[in-house]
Amino acid sequence: MSDTEEQEYEEEQAEDEEAVEEEEAPEEPEPVAEREEERPKPSRPVVPPLIPPKIPEGERVDFDDIHRKRMEKDLLELQTLIDVHFEQRKKEEEELIALKDRIERRRAERAEQQRFRTEKERERQAKLAEEKMRKEEEEAKKRAEDDAKKKKVLSNMGAHFGGYLVKAEQKRGKRQTGREMKLRILSERKKPLNIDYMGEDQLREKAQELSEWIHQLESEKFDLMEKLKQQKYEINVLYNRISHAQKFRKGAGKGRVGGRWK
């Protein structure tokens, strides 16, 4: 508090004390006649004026110090809020950077997986094309051999019909050995499925590969069944021709005797 304010405050206190002393001073006695004539008035309670507490002389209120402390407190709170804000922002930036890193890593992993699938699919297609070409070459070669055998059988049908029957019997025996060979090949082709270590994408890829393999096997089975039907039909035709030719040969070899021997 400044000196001027302190002086004004002391003057106000002095005036208030004088007013209280005037109110408390005893009134002069009035004449008896006047008091009798006047009617008594109800007494009103005297309310003492509000007097601010006196501040001791040795202590003074330093408003500048209070204002300074309040400013320091507000500044400290503001600095705390700023620090919290920047810490939160730093944390969010770190999380954003980590998220970007995860996205980039996953994108790279997906690209690598896609590249691996593409390369594997390319190898599979090349293998299928090579296998198809090899089968076509084998079928063409086998078809040429079958045609040569058919021509040879037809040319030697009359003289070697018995040998053909023997070959047919041998083919029947070979069918039994072919069954054993088929079982052996199936046992060799049948491989265990090790799918315990595979993930979801690998299982999906394995299922797709098995589905395509089954489709290919069904197609090969259909082709082989059609080929077997054709071969059976050709064998039946040749067998009928041989049987027909054999009947004519047997009829030509027998002689009919006419008349009676005496």
From Swiss-Prot:
Compositionally biased tracts (Basic and acidic residues): 32-41, 109-149
Residue stretches of biased makeup (Pro residues): 43-55
Any one GO CC term of the record: troponin complex
Tissue: Expressed in adult soleus muscle.
Family: Belongs to the troponin T family.
Oligomeric form and interacting partners: Interacts with TPM3.
Function as written in the Swiss-Prot or TrEMBL entry: Troponin T is the tropomyosin-binding subunit of troponin, the thin filament regulatory complex which confers calcium-sensitivity to striated muscle actomyosin ATPase activity.
Name of this protein: Troponin T, slow skeletal muscle
